[in-house]
Amino acid sequence: MLRSRRLALLCLATPLWLAACASVTPTRGFDASETAASQLYTGRFSANYVRYGRNEGVQGSFRWQEQGRNVRLDLVSPLGQTLAIVTATPSGATLDLPNEAPRNAPEVDSLMEQALGFSLPVSGMRDWLHGRAAPGTPSNVTRDANGRPDTLRQSGWTVRYLAWQDTPENATPTTTLPRRIDMARDGNESPLSVRLVIDPENKE
């Protein structure tokens, strides 16, 4: 119980989370060349990781908006304060934090790791949120009795699909969307586990 309370209040225990009461405005927009339909996912997240040899944890809600290969990810504390806004496009990534100058990098994963101490695998999540492996990268997928992904291993991550959204009877494995996803980074050097619980009303 004590550990759970510490994790729930972690967002108030470090300078980053204390600064979250300030408003955060994303500085990078989506690439204008993208014409694909926009998709929106919202839900809750939790992450457990090791930083400076100590076990850490954070949780809150997220808002994931994608258009083609463009992604904007908002992380919000349990108190409703913006923790970070991540914008990733084919041309680069930007991380906006409260009361700090925007940080830019060619890709988003290492940018989050350096600034936050943990990194959601945004590059892979573009496809994993749809219940599929990312194209162009080796993967290993096991499926359940309904043909839906059960475990997906790709890019140094193990992704487990633990629950699926309620769907019409005529839904197929390619149209069903995940409800709960557990992700763990492979290896022991920098342990990181992430849980996503996706709201059922998400839609394209």
Curated annotation (Swiss-Prot):
Chain residue ranges for the region called Disordered: 131-150
Keyword line: Cell outer membrane, Chaperone, Lipoprotein, Membrane, Palmitate, Protein transport, Signal, Transport
Top-level taxon in the UniProt lineage: Bacteria
Subunit annotation: Monomer.
GO annotation terms (biological process): lipoprotein localization to outer membrane; protein transport
Location(s), subcellular: Cell outer membrane
A single cellular component GO annotation: cell outer membrane
Gene3D superfamilies: Lipoprotein localisation LolA/LolB/LppX (2.50.20.10)
Record PROSITE patterns: PROKAR_LIPOPROTEIN
Lipidation (N-palmitoyl cysteine): 21
Signal peptide: 1-20
Protein name, entry field: Outer-membrane lipoprotein LolB
Family of this protein: Belongs to the LolB family.
Entries under Pfam families matching the protein: LolB
Lipid addition sites, S-diacylglycerol cysteine: 21
Membrane topology term: Lipid-anchor
HAMAP family: LolB
Biological role stated in the UniProt entry: Plays a critical role in the incorporation of lipoproteins in the outer membrane after they are released by the LolA protein.
